[in-house]
Structure formats: C-alpha cells, structure tokens
C-alpha cells in the first residue's frame, strides 16, 4: 500500500516575488532549474524560503541566483555548514544564457526571480527579463488597479 505524505508541499508555488511586478516591467519569461543541496530541499519543503530580493547574475557564462534566502531547519545535518544566502547555480541552456546576457548588456535590462515552484519532483525558478519602473510608472499602475477595482465594485452593485 502507498503511504500518504500529508506534510510535504510538492504541488504548486513555493514562493513568489510580488515586489518584482511592482518595481519592474516584466517582459521575457524563462524557466530554470536550481542546483541545490539536501538541507535546502528539506527547508524548501518546510516553506522556509524567501525570494523577495532575489536577482540573477551571470559570471563566466553561468547564471547564479543571488539574494534568495533559504533558512536551514533545526534538524539539518550538523556536519554541513548551512549558508542561507549563498549564490545558487541556475540550470539554463547555453542559448538562454546568451540571450539573457545580451539583453542585460545592450538594452539595460535586469534579470529578476519572480516565482519558485515544484515541477514534478524538481524545484524550478521562473525568471524574467525586466526593465525598472520610475516612480511615476508605479503611481500610474496603482491608479489603474484602483480604477479597475472601482469599476468591478460599481458593476457588482449595479446588477
């Protein structure tokens, strides 16, 4: 018989970076795998991950996730030194890395992490090419959101 593992979070989103949608115009989307250690997987299953300030750097034709915090569990292995904010290598194809590098260097884009999720048994990271917003752009998007809410409210009450 198959045992149910109710405490494991193996479906859907692990973490989201909602701040990225507010601070950047998100354009091209990529899916990347992560090179993780055993204690990091255990912490991710427990939900102890934060990607709010995460971004991607490219060095020596390899992409790394920087600013992602994975807090170690208390039961984690004692013989491994846990570094919660270490740079984690992203698993991308060569042409994807080349495209990211070109856009970052020539057009002034940033590369930000927007979502971390499970895909089957693998942890995947959704990254976007992004262009920074100015203060007036942020205000405009907030005004548009408020207007959309008001329209929905008016339509709901008028019916």
Swiss-Prot record:
Residues 138-159 are annotated as: Disordered. GO terms for molecular function: RNA binding. It comes from the Bacteria. It is found in: Cytoplasm. One of its GO terms (cellular component) is cytosol. InterPro entries: SmpB, SsrA-bd_prot, SsrA-bd_prot_CS. One of its GO terms (biological process) is trans-translation. Keywords: Cytoplasm, RNA-binding. CDD domains: SmpB. Required for rescue of stalled ribosomes mediated by trans-translation. Binds to transfer-messenger RNA (tmRNA), required for stable association of tmRNA with ribosomes. tmRNA and SmpB together mimic tRNA shape, replacing the anticodon stem-loop with SmpB. tmRNA is encoded by the ssrA gene; the 2 termini fold to resemble tRNA(Ala) and it encodes a 'tag peptide', a short internal open reading frame. During trans-translation Ala-aminoacylated tmRNA acts like a tRNA, entering the A-site of stalled ribosomes, displacing the stalled mRNA. HAMAP family: SmpB (MF_00023). NCBIfam families: PRK05422.1, smpB. Belongs to the SmpB family. This is SsrA-binding protein. The gene is smpB.
């Amino acid at each position: 018989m198959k045992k149910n593992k109710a405490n494991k979070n193996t479906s859907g989103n692990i973490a989201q970076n909602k701040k990225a949608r507010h601070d950047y115009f998100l354009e091209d989307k990529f899916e990347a795998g992560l090179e993780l250690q055993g204690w990091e997987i255990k912490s991710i299953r427990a939900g102890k991950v934060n990607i709010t300030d995460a971004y991607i750097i490219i060095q020596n034709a390899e992409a790394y996730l920087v600013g992602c915090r994975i807090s170690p569990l208390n039961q984690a292995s004692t013989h491994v030194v846990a570094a919660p904010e270490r740079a984690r290598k992203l698993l991308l194809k060569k042409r994807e890395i080349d495209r990211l590098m070109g856009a970052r260097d020539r057009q002034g884009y940033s590369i930000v992490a927007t979502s971390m999720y499970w895909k089957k048994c693998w942890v995947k990271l959704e990254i976007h090419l992004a262009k920074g917003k100015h203060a007036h752009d942020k205000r405009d998007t907030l005004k548009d959101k408020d207007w959309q809410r008001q329209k929905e409210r008016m339509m709901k009450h008028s019916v």
